[in-house]
Amino acid sequence: MTKVNSQKYSKALLEVAQEKGQLEAILSEVSEMIQLFKEDNLVAFLSSEVYSFSAKSELIDTLLQTSSEVMSNFLNTVRSNGRLGDLGEILDETKNAADDMFKIADVGVVSSIALTNAQIEKFTAMAKAKFDLNEVTVINTVNEKILGGFIVNSRGKIIDASLKTQLAKIAAEIL
Protein backbone atom coordinates (compact mmCIF):
# COMPACT_ATOMS: atom_id res chain seq x y z
CA MET A 1 0.00 0.00 0.00
CA THR A 2 1.22 3.46 -0.69
CA LYS A 3 1.70 6.00 2.05
CA VAL A 4 -1.04 8.12 0.44
CA ASN A 5 -3.57 5.31 0.81
CA SER A 6 -2.65 4.60 4.41
CA GLN A 7 -2.93 8.34 5.09
CA LYS A 8 -6.46 8.32 3.63
CA TYR A 9 -7.55 5.49 5.92
CA SER A 10 -5.93 7.06 8.98
CA LYS A 11 -7.42 10.47 8.21
CA ALA A 12 -10.87 8.93 7.85
CA LEU A 13 -10.55 7.14 11.19
CA LEU A 14 -9.37 10.28 12.98
CA GLU A 15 -12.13 12.42 11.44
CA VAL A 16 -14.88 10.00 12.45
CA ALA A 17 -13.42 9.67 15.95
CA GLN A 18 -13.28 13.45 16.28
CA GLU A 19 -16.87 13.86 15.03
CA LYS A 20 -18.09 11.36 17.60
CA GLY A 21 -15.99 12.87 20.40
CA GLN A 22 -14.03 9.65 20.82
CA LEU A 23 -10.60 10.74 19.61
CA GLU A 24 -8.71 9.90 22.82
CA ALA A 25 -10.40 6.50 23.11
CA ILE A 26 -9.62 5.64 19.47
CA LEU A 27 -6.00 6.74 19.83
CA SER A 28 -5.73 4.52 22.89
CA GLU A 29 -7.13 1.59 20.89
CA VAL A 30 -4.73 2.33 18.03
CA SER A 31 -1.77 2.30 20.43
CA GLU A 32 -2.92 -0.98 21.96
CA MET A 33 -3.31 -2.56 18.52
CA ILE A 34 0.11 -1.35 17.39
CA GLN A 35 1.63 -2.92 20.51
CA LEU A 36 -0.31 -6.15 19.96
CA PHE A 37 0.75 -6.28 16.31
CA LYS A 38 4.42 -5.88 17.29
CA GLU A 39 4.35 -8.40 20.14
CA ASP A 40 2.53 -11.12 18.24
CA ASN A 41 3.96 -10.34 14.76
CA LEU A 42 0.45 -9.90 13.38
CA VAL A 43 1.65 -7.63 10.56
CA ALA A 44 3.49 -10.59 9.02
CA PHE A 45 0.43 -12.80 9.50
CA LEU A 46 -1.97 -10.34 7.86
CA SER A 47 0.34 -9.50 4.96
CA SER A 48 1.34 -13.10 4.25
CA GLU A 49 -0.07 -14.87 1.20
CA VAL A 50 0.26 -18.20 3.04
CA TYR A 51 -2.75 -17.61 5.29
CA SER A 52 -6.28 -17.56 3.94
CA PHE A 53 -8.57 -14.57 4.02
CA SER A 54 -10.86 -16.47 6.40
CA ALA A 55 -8.00 -17.04 8.88
CA LYS A 56 -7.14 -13.34 8.75
CA SER A 57 -10.82 -12.48 9.06
CA GLU A 58 -11.06 -14.59 12.23
CA LEU A 59 -8.31 -12.47 13.76
CA ILE A 60 -10.28 -9.32 12.93
CA ASP A 61 -13.40 -10.90 14.46
CA THR A 62 -11.40 -11.46 17.66
CA LEU A 63 -10.28 -7.82 17.66
CA LEU A 64 -13.88 -6.69 17.11
CA GLN A 65 -14.96 -8.32 20.39
CA THR A 66 -13.05 -5.72 22.42
CA SER A 67 -13.20 -2.78 20.01
CA SER A 68 -15.37 0.32 20.21
CA GLU A 69 -18.08 0.90 17.61
CA VAL A 70 -15.91 3.36 15.67
CA MET A 71 -12.93 0.99 15.63
CA SER A 72 -15.16 -1.96 14.74
CA ASN A 73 -16.57 -0.07 11.75
CA PHE A 74 -13.05 0.91 10.72
CA LEU A 75 -11.72 -2.66 10.95
CA ASN A 76 -14.71 -3.96 8.97
CA THR A 77 -14.09 -1.32 6.28
CA VAL A 78 -10.42 -2.29 6.03
CA ARG A 79 -11.43 -5.96 5.79
CA SER A 80 -14.16 -5.39 3.18
CA ASN A 81 -11.76 -3.31 1.06
CA GLY A 82 -9.21 -6.13 1.11
CA ARG A 83 -6.60 -4.11 3.00
CA LEU A 84 -5.92 -6.42 5.95
CA GLY A 85 -2.31 -6.80 4.83
CA ASP A 86 -1.91 -3.04 5.19
CA LEU A 87 -3.55 -2.70 8.60
CA GLY A 88 -0.26 -2.39 10.50
CA GLU A 89 0.89 0.42 8.22
CA ILE A 90 -2.49 2.15 8.51
CA LEU A 91 -2.35 2.00 12.33
CA ASP A 92 1.21 3.39 12.33
CA GLU A 93 0.13 6.21 10.03
CA THR A 94 -2.83 6.94 12.32
CA LYS A 95 -0.50 7.29 15.30
CA ASN A 96 1.85 9.53 13.30
CA ALA A 97 -1.02 11.74 12.13
CA ALA A 98 -2.33 12.05 15.70
CA ASP A 99 1.16 12.90 16.96
CA ASP A 100 1.36 15.62 14.31
CA MET A 101 -2.07 16.90 15.30
CA PHE A 102 -1.15 17.14 18.99
CA LYS A 103 2.52 18.04 18.38
CA ILE A 104 3.91 14.96 20.12
CA ALA A 105 7.22 13.36 19.17
CA ASP A 106 9.97 11.02 20.21
CA VAL A 107 13.31 12.81 20.01
CA GLY A 108 16.44 10.75 19.60
CA VAL A 109 19.58 12.10 21.24
CA VAL A 110 22.86 10.38 20.40
CA SER A 111 25.64 11.20 22.85
CA SER A 112 29.05 9.81 23.70
CA ILE A 113 27.94 9.10 27.29
CA ALA A 114 24.55 8.44 28.88
CA LEU A 115 22.58 11.58 29.65
CA THR A 116 21.67 12.53 33.21
CA ASN A 117 18.08 13.33 34.16
CA ALA A 118 18.93 17.04 34.23
CA GLN A 119 20.36 16.83 30.71
CA ILE A 120 17.29 14.95 29.49
CA GLU A 121 15.10 17.72 30.91
CA LYS A 122 17.20 20.33 29.06
CA PHE A 123 16.93 18.37 25.81
CA THR A 124 13.18 18.07 26.32
CA ALA A 125 12.83 21.84 26.73
CA MET A 126 15.12 22.49 23.76
CA ALA A 127 13.23 20.05 21.53
CA LYS A 128 9.88 21.59 22.45
CA ALA A 129 11.18 25.03 21.44
CA LYS A 130 13.21 24.06 18.34
CA PHE A 131 10.71 21.61 16.86
CA ASP A 132 7.48 23.35 18.03
CA LEU A 133 6.25 20.40 20.11
CA ASN A 134 3.90 20.14 23.08
CA GLU A 135 5.05 16.75 24.34
CA VAL A 136 8.47 15.16 23.93
CA THR A 137 9.94 11.79 24.85
CA VAL A 138 13.74 11.84 24.76
CA ILE A 139 15.35 8.57 23.70
CA ASN A 140 19.07 8.59 24.51
CA THR A 141 21.45 6.37 22.56
CA VAL A 142 25.12 6.14 23.47
CA ASN A 143 27.61 6.12 20.59
CA GLU A 144 31.21 6.64 21.63
CA LYS A 145 32.25 7.20 18.00
CA ILE A 146 30.86 10.76 18.04
CA LEU A 147 33.63 11.59 20.57
CA GLY A 148 31.59 14.28 22.35
CA GLY A 149 28.63 16.59 21.88
CA PHE A 150 25.31 15.25 20.64
CA ILE A 151 23.10 14.57 17.64
CA VAL A 152 19.38 15.32 18.01
CA ASN A 153 16.88 13.77 15.59
CA SER A 154 13.15 14.44 15.54
CA ARG A 155 11.10 13.29 12.56
CA GLY A 156 13.92 13.70 10.11
CA LYS A 157 15.08 17.06 11.44
CA ILE A 158 18.64 16.75 12.71
CA ILE A 159 20.80 18.97 14.88
CA ASP A 160 24.37 17.65 14.72
CA ALA A 161 26.60 19.17 17.39
CA SER A 162 28.94 16.19 17.66
CA LEU A 163 32.66 16.65 18.02
CA LYS A 164 33.23 14.12 15.23
CA THR A 165 31.27 16.27 12.74
CA GLN A 166 32.97 19.47 13.87
CA LEU A 167 36.41 17.86 13.42
CA ALA A 168 35.40 16.58 9.98
CA LYS A 169 34.36 20.13 8.97
CA ILE A 170 37.70 21.53 10.14
CA ALA A 171 39.58 18.80 8.26
CA ALA A 172 37.60 19.57 5.09
CA GLU A 173 38.43 23.28 5.39
CA ILE A 174 42.13 22.57 5.86
CA LEU A 175 42.29 20.26 2.86
Curated annotation (Swiss-Prot):
Keywords: ATP synthesis, Cell membrane, CF(1), Hydrogen ion transport, Ion transport, Membrane, Transport
Record localization: Cell membrane
Keyword flag Transport: yes
A Pfam family reported for this protein in Swiss-Prot or TrEMBL: OSCP
Extent of the signal sequence: none
Gene Ontology MF annotations: proton-transporting ATP synthase activity, rotational mechanism
Main location: membrane
GO CC field: plasma membrane; proton-transporting ATP synthase complex
Database matches in Gene3D superfamilies: N-terminal domain of the delta subunit of the F1F0-ATP synthase (1.10.520.20)
Membrane topology: Peripheral membrane protein
Domain of life: Bacteria
InterPro entries per the UniProt record, alphabetical: ATP_synth_OSCP/delta_N_sf (IPR026015), ATPase_OSCP/dsu (IPR000711)
Xref: NCBIfam families: ATP_synt_delta, PRK05758.2-1
Family statement: Belongs to the ATPase delta chain family.
Complex formation: F-type ATPases have 2 components, F(1) - the catalytic core - and F(0) - the membrane proton channel. F(1) has five subunits: alpha(3), beta(3), gamma(1), delta(1), epsilon(1). F(0) has three main subunits: a(1), b(2) and c(10-14). The alpha and beta chains form an alternating ring which encloses part of the gamma chain. F(1) is attached to F(0) by a central stalk formed by the gamma and epsilon chains, while a peripheral stalk is formed by the delta and b chains.
Described function: F(1)F(0) ATP synthase produces ATP from ADP in the presence of a proton or sodium gradient. F-type ATPases consist of two structural domains, F(1) containing the extramembraneous catalytic core and F(0) containing the membrane proton channel, linked together by a central stalk and a peripheral stalk. During catalysis, ATP synthesis in the catalytic domain of F(1) is coupled via a rotary mechanism of the central stalk subunits to proton translocation.
Name this protein carries in UniProt: ATP synthase subunit delta
Underlying gene: atpH
